[in-house]
């Protein structure tokens, strides 16, 4: 029987995607309302969801780190293809590198912190 990961895991990943879009907006001094935000976010949200389903990211099992890393690479790849084909936004290679780097650092980073805290709690309890 498989066990599902806590819902907060998906929420934490979604927060990483939102942070990516908001930091990009600030870094490039872009202005726009909710429409702009959604226009930039949707390819990444769809890409992440598709990749998470393929990699079974939110189903407990073996190799969670590899599944998370694969989700980052596959999710950004899908997002860039969607962005290039269904929007008028440019998709330079460096954008993909930045997206993979940021999302790897944040989504794998919060998992690393949670794992370290879990180990610490387990050692204190023992």
Give names to the regions the model predicted.
Residues 2-37:
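Membrane-helix boundary elements
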Residues 8-9, 104-126:
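Membrane-water interface at the C-terminal end of transmembrane alpha helices
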Residues 18, 43, 70-81, 102:
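Small-residue-rich segments of transmembrane alpha-helices in multi-pass membrane proteins
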Residues 19-28, 46, 50-58, 78-82, ...:
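Alpha-helical membrane-inserting segments
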Residues 30-32, 61-62, 88-90:
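Membrane-interface helix caps and helix-loop-helix hairpins in membrane proteins
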Residues 34-46, 96:
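Structural signature of hydrophobic alpha-helical transmembrane segments
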Residues 56-74, 93-100:
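Internal alpha-helical transmembrane segments of multi-pass membrane proteins
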Residues 82-98:
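Membrane-helix boundary connector in multi-pass membrane proteins
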